[in-house]
């Protein structure tokens, strides 16, 4: 689930890792964006979506929204202890692990950056790297509206990133599942700068697969159907 279309970036990786599973995707575009709403409202919206998914018979859940993860995933796990639940968070750890001492920008919604979960990440890794949060209110709407390139998007990147881009900036963490769909235009904006773009879609999908496997829920069977060969038809006469 996600607040809109962004979680499709996680679904894409999950399908690659678990091709034998059946997936249901719920994008709550009616209430998007979550990232500018109060925490209590985000929690209520997330629970409403999860209850719909449970009615559909799901056996596992990926909360493919950084904002919903921060606001609700802990309470979801307490409420549904038997359900494998994974969330997503800005991929700060991989960025720091791969860092060579340069600046790391973290693009995310205002609510994600404000939440305790991100603040704990920041506190944990701030001594190891120069981490700069970049508040990107309004960016996910470009994806929701299908505006994945163009001058308006370039102008947005210029407004948000130009003040914090330095010669030693080495990575940008895409801290919202919508943002990977903007990679091409972001690279166009960055030009010839050698900056690594990092997102958490693959890591979230791997964790979902791991939890399903631990609980014996991962589907590994495969059904094969064939039409009779000419030789088989001859034998049956």
Residue locations for each model-derived region?
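Non-catalytic structural scaffold of enzyme domains
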Residues: 1-227, 231
């Amino acid at each position: 689930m996600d607040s809109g279309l962004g979680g499709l970036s996680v679904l894409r990786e999950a399908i690659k890792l678990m091709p034998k599973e059946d997936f249901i995707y719920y994008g709550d575009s009616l209430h998007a964006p979550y990232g500018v709403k109060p925490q209590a409202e985000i929690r209520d919206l997330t629970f409403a979506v999860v209850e719909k998914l449970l009615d559909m018979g799901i056996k596992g859940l990926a909360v493919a929204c950084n904002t919903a993860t921060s606001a609700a995933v802990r309470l979801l796990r307490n409420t549904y202890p038997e359900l494998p639940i994974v969330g997503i968070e800005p991929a700060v750890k991989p960025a720091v692990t791969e860092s060579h001492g340069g600046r790391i920008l973290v693009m995310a919604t205002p609510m994600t950056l404000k939440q305790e979960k991100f603040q704990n990440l920041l506190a944990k890794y701030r001594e190891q790297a120069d981490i700069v949060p970049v508040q990107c209110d309004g960016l996910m709407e470009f994806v929701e509206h299908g505006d994945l390139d163009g001058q308006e998007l370039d102008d947005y990147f210029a407004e948000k990133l130009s003040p914090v881009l330095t010669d030693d900036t080495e990575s940008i963490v895409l801290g919202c599942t919508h943002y990977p769909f903007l990679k091409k235009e972001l690279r166009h904006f960055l030009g010839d700068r050698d900056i690594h773009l990092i997102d958490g879609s693959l890591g979230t999908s791997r964790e979902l697969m791991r939890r399903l496997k631990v609980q014996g829920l991962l589907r590994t069977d495969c059904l094969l159907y064939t039409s009779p060969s000419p030789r088989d038809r001859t034998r049956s006469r």
